Amino acid sequence: MKLRDSLAVNKSIRLQAEAETWQDAVKIGVDLLVAADVVEPRYYQAILDGVEQFGPYFVIAPGLTMPHGRPEEGVKKTGFSLVTLKKPLEFNHDDNDPVDILITMAAVDANTHQEVGIMQIVNLFEDEENFDRLRACRTEQEVLDLIDRTNAAA
């Protein structure tokens, strides 16, 4: 499933969210996927367990994190949620803190995870100005329009 379609169909966008800790921020993204029946509630704990084991492996660029677990950790279908934070948070990453954009991903298999999920997110942020454009979005439609413009330019 495409990033844009998943966000639109699942109504899984939350802008200017408030969170006290990185764990709270991750939970916001996972809860959107739980509400859309994309993942089971246990997916949240699986992500936390992954961080405990491997560190903040999903902080992939300055200000951007892509929380995700493994397919067998509660994924029902492939989907994404997108959360922007009102106040950036520390994820304990050496290079890319603080974070204020979270794209939570659930993939049914490793191939989908790598080829579909990561590539769509890389495409969105290939234009670094899209970080600030996304931070400026205040409605779901503005986010979807930004993704549409990026896809049209690709």
From Swiss-Prot:
Gene: ulaC
Entry keyword annotation includes Cytoplasm: yes
SUPFAM superfamilies: Phoshotransferase/anion transport protein
Domain notes: The PTS EIIA type-2 domain is phosphorylated by phospho-HPr on a histidyl residue. Then, it transfers the phosphoryl group to the PTS EIIB type-2 domain.
Keyword annotations from UniProtKB, A to Z: Cytoplasm, Kinase, Phosphoprotein, Phosphotransferase system, Transferase, Transport
Domain PTS EIIA type-2: 6-150
One function term, GO molecular function aspect: kinase activity
Induction and repression of expression: Induced by L-ascorbate. Repressed by UlaR.
One of the protein's GO biological processes: phosphoenolpyruvate-dependent sugar phosphotransferase system
Name the record gives this protein: Ascorbate-specific PTS system EIIA component
Catalytic center residues: 68 (tele-phosphohistidine intermediate)
Domain of life: Bacteria
Places the protein is found: Cytoplasm
Positions bearing Phosphohistidine: 68
Organism of provenance: Shigella dysenteriae serotype 1 (strain Sd197)
GO CC, one annotated term: cytoplasm
One Pfam family from the record: PTS_EIIA_2
